[in-house]
Amino acid sequence: MISFQQKILNLIKCFRRQWPLFSNSERTTVCGADRMLTALQLSMAEVNKQHHGDFAVSPSDVMETWKYLLHDKLGLSYENMEEPENYAAFKEAYHTFLASSNMLDIIDIYQKCCALALLSEDERIAPIQLLEFISGAMNVSESNGSVLPSTPVNRQDQSSVKVMLFAKNCFYSYLSLLVNSKDDLALACILNVPDRGLGREAFTKLKHASRERKMSIFLMATSFIRTVEHGGKGCAASLFDPLRVHVKELSNFINFIDKLGEIVGEIPDPRVAGGQILSTVKMHLMKGQSNGDPFYQAVEKVVQDLDLKIKNIIDSQHEVLTASTTGVSPTRPKLHSINHGTAYCGRDTIKVLLVLLDEEAVSAPTQNKAELLYDDVNLNMFGITSVLTLFRSPAQSKESSPKPSRQRIQKPVNEKIIKMKRSSIKSQFACTYKNELSKIRSQHFLSSSQVPACMHPAPKQHLQGKYFTEGMNSCLDIPVLGTISENVHQNRNYREMGKLSCQPRNKNSKNEQMDLNNDNVIHDEESETSLPKNAKKLKTSNNPQKELDSKIGGKRKNNRTASKNKLIVGQAKLTQFFKL
């Protein structure tokens, strides 16, 4: 008669043969009873954090929801059970966690196999039997050669069992992460085993970064290290990346996993490759340990047990293959099997490791659920943080740095640049000018939007007086400040540009000129008649080299040139004095 564990293992074998019907990846791992409970605990804590702000959940609530979830998924009656609060959110978060970790639990595989009718009569399992097995109510005899004693006698035996469980969990976590790079539970167990300096702070930063990029934690760490090591200037990691503090530690961890992957890809024999993988992990865990340490001895026993299991798996596979292919020529592998998920030379090793992990998934669940859920005391013996404590990482603070560091650094730099920037020198006495000159100009001069567009009517056009009262002749664009404020040092270009005017002139009209020694303005008869009576008159000078033309074209293309040539009161006299 087939044992119950063997029936569940046959379910998983059926899943491996028809994996495209179940999952998108051949490397999908099976979540056993203990890991199902741990995943539910983390999912409930995450939902509680969203609703109440605290990443925590009581053991009684976990066990109540666990019992209700098993009945719900197996389709069993739960009339006498009350639905837990936020059960729908707990269930959704649980399935989301498994999907993001590329895992399927035993119940999902069972339901899929039953729906597809992939089981024979002898392999069928009743839902109530599966419920009793997962919940731990069924008495299951361990017949897979486990190194763990069934009933520890005294405290010393209990301590040795805890050490053995911890060592076994470390090995299976390394193998699971090697096969399934999305397994966040496996990563949390071995990220800092042995001590690499990647404690809770590093795990917190990795978790936040992985959620921002919607990647698994291990793939996020791998992507960061690859960017640091091989990225050029264009794709280098940011200087303000919080993971830069842990570059060395993360690099050591990623390089070790890469070393295990190289063993899988380079050694074609799965027996040799499996033994070398176990030996590499063993030497890695034993660093700093002496022969008399309990952990050292536990690692030795676990390696021997796993090595024996790998050999038994390979032998059983050869027996099945020999029995099924007797007298039949070997066929070529299917097209989708080649290079699907791994290099072809390492496929046999990966398949052996998957079978090893599947056998561990069907092992009997832990009887002491409280010890499984809250194992802080047990893990403190090895200086390890529990999975729940790791995932209880606080949210990143946003109050200490409201703006990015680059903006906070750039702001004072820009302020210094603004202080150092000065206006261009307008004359040799510009350093003696007051800062109120710009205010005076803004008060006495009109902007380009305030001055109407230049027209070309008849020479004698009457303009509105309000433009003159504000200090500007809209036609000739002559500013009136009460005194002459024109620059004497104009070159020929400015004189030529000043010949433009808003109104057309007659060829016989006289040019307006300025006399620096007089305060009166004279005109010719034509220009005088075009001005209103209340406008101030300008006086011209007979010296053409000191000519100042304040008339700018209607399109005001030379507005900047005119603004640079404006002088304050008394500057023209000082300039003439120093010329003498």
Curated annotation (Swiss-Prot):
It is found in: Cytoplasm; Nucleus. It comes from the Eukaryota. GO terms for cellular component: chromatin; cytoplasm; nucleus. InterPro entries: P-loop_NTPase, PARPBP. Disulfide bonds: none annotated. Transmembrane segments: none annotated. One of its GO terms (molecular function) is DNA binding. Belongs to the PARI family. This is PCNA-interacting partner. It comes from Gallus gallus. The lineage of its organism: Eukaryota, Metazoa, Chordata, Craniata, Vertebrata.
